[in-house]
Amino acid sequence: MSNSIEQQQTPEVPPLKYGEREIAKGELFTFPNPRIGRHYQIHITLPEFTCKCPFSGYPDFATIYLTYVPNEKVVELKAIKLYINNYRDLYISHEEAVNQILDDFVAACDPLEVQIKGDYNPRGNVHTVIEVNYQKAN
């Protein structure tokens, strides 16, 4: 028997692809509202939202509808796409996902008003729609 210790080799993890790196950042970037003081709505539809059920691990699919009245900042569209894609591997309930999106959006954009609706694809004959709202205090 030899006194040398065998080293176990762990498989090398391949580097992230450029899209995976961008999604991992997932920050909500904003830019100045070009019409501060004007009350207008922005509607964003994100039809490819995915996350994982925290109980079963099965994937959940939804369309996220975001409608907001900007204050001083507007969300950059590519940034919200990448932010939403960051949920794809998270184990999170429908309710928590939509509420977390609202919290993060309000923190990044400080809108006057925002409504976020998660319309989840039916699974097991159950269709879930989660809707949350925020209105800035005067």
Swiss-Prot record:
It catalyses: 7-aminomethyl-7-carbaguanine + 2 NADP(+) = 7-cyano-7-deazaguanine + 2 NADPH + 3 H(+). Its EC number is 1.7.1.13. GO terms for molecular function: preQ1 synthase activity. Substrate binds at V75, E76, L77, H94, E95. GO terms for biological process: queuosine biosynthetic process; tRNA modification. Keywords: Cytoplasm, NADP, Oxidoreductase, Queuosine biosynthesis. SUPFAM superfamilies: Tetrahydrobiopterin biosynthesis enzymes-like (SSF55620). Belongs to the GTP cyclohydrolase I family. QueF type 1 subfamily. This is NADPH-dependent 7-cyano-7-deazaguanine reductase. The gene is queF.
